[in-house]
């Protein structure tokens, strides 16, 4: 299947978006840790965790049926439209710059967890990108699946 310059540019833009989202998260203290109790999370934190779980289940089903295009499209839209365009913007207001509140720490944990899920789900089709993004910062290369 030939790839045109538009498809290559779209793939580059997505990889850049993923890299920048991860960079933002790590610069703001996000990391993979045990999730706090659900009652302690903000509405936005609960929403993105629920959506990430829905996406994970759908992507798993698509991959089990060898429907790679559907899995990738779902991940693309979740990552770009929901995680980056919505949740990251909300997270910017929940993670304070001048001190750490409990809600700010919870948002860091949720952001780290959701990024870890996204990188794991993207890994089968974008292994070089996901390893480059997570190798030095997150747990993808060293944790079992």
Identify the meaning behind each predicted range.
Residues 1-39:
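Catalytic adenosine-cofactor/nucleotide-binding cores of aminoacyl-tRNA synthetases and other
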Residues 6-11, 97-118:
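Short secondary-structure subsegments characteristic of cysteine-rich extracellular domains
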Residues 30-34, 91, 95, 99, ...:
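Structured alpha-helical bundle/scaffold domains in large eukaryotic membrane-trafficking regulators
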Residues 52-70:
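Long, non-coiled-coil amphipathic alpha-helical linker/lever segments
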């Amino acid at each position: 299947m030939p790839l045109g310059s538009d498809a290559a540019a779209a793939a580059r833009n997505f990889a850049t978006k993923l890299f920048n989202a991860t960079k933002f998260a790590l610069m703001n203290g996000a990391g993979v840790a045990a999730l706090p109790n659900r009652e302690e999370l903000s509405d936005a934190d609960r929403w993105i965790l629920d959506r990430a779980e829905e996406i994970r289940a759908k992507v798993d089903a698509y991959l089990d049926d060898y429907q790679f295009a559907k899995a990738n499209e779902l991940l693309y839209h979740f990552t770009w439209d929901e995680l980056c365009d919505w949740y990251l913007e909300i997270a910017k207001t929940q993670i304070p710059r001048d001190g750490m509140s409990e809600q700010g720490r919870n948002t860091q944990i949720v952001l780290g967890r959701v990024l870890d899920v996204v990188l794991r789900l993207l890994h089968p089709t974008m292994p070089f990108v996901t390893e480059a993004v997570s190798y030095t910062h997150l747990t993808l290369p060293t944790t079992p699946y």
